[in-house]
Amino acid sequence: KDFNNRKSVLNGVFRHAVLNEIITFSPITDLPCNTLKFKLPNASKKAYTVEERAMLLSYLKTLEQDAYTLAIQFAFYGIFRVGEIKGLTWDTENENIITIKQQLVEERTLQEDMTFSHPHRVLKDPKGNPFYSIRTEELPEAGINILRKMKELNPNGKLVFMHEGRPLTTDTFNRRLKKYCGELGITYLSSHKIRFTNASMLFDAGVKAIDIQPLLGHSNLAMTQHYIGQRTTERDSTEMARILA
């Protein structure tokens, strides 16, 4: 899949070059891809454990609070995409319930010289079918307290999470998260894996997949199945011997 994704990007670039008469033909079409064989990737960790989540939250609370430390904490109290956190706006109707109605993304455009422009921020509908991805989530008290703290730090901002008057960036969010994981000796997983973590914690606690689906903003249950069921507790290596004794 990764190879095909990269091939599609290259194919688009070379096709653009042919259409603009920069080159005469696309070399991608001559690649003998049908004979290629790929080794399956090793299984990778897709979620923080409950213990790692608790360690991160406890540690983050000891730091000087800013929009990034608070946004990382906030991510662990819901099932959000990082772009949805960046695009969150103030809701004065109900403090406990947030409406996820947009995401803030950084986009680049392919220029005539075949280079990409500097990223520019765009507010868009949440990823996927808006009928499902625009949704509400009820927050625990800890999540509400984070919003209250952000209101103190950013009382007049158009967006909830703003750092020094500017919207957050995904790169800085993940760079900070990686830094804090390193300081704790925890394996770093990106912001998107926090979504896996929280969805799996709900599933482990007995919440049905069909009830987790709307919280993730998914249009079908099959997509949700990919997120839930990740390991959030350490495996008991003695379990088999005990059961089969």
Sequence positions of predicted segments:
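Active-site/catalytic core of tyrosine-dependent DNA strand-transfer enzymes
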Residues: 138-186
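DNA/chromatin major-groove-contacting recognition/catalytic segments
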Residues: 111-113, 226-245
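Hydrophobic (often cysteine-bearing) scaffold residues that line and stabilize catalytic clefts
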Residues: 2, 6-10, 67-68, 81, ...
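C-terminal catalytic core of tyrosine-transesterase DNA break-rejoin enzymes
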Residues: 73, 77, 83-84, 179-183, ...
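Basic, Lys/Arg- and aromatic-enriched nucleic-acid-binding interface segment
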Residues: 4, 8, 19, 23-25, ...
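N-terminal core-binding DNA-recognition domain of tyrosine site-specific recombinases/integrases
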Residues: 1-16, 20-22, 42, 167-170, ...
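Conserved tyrosine-mediated DNA breakage-rejoining catalytic core shared by Y-recombinases
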Residues: 87-149
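Proline-centered turn/helix-capping motifs that create local helix->coil transitions or kinks
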Residues: 18-29, 95, 106-110, 149-157
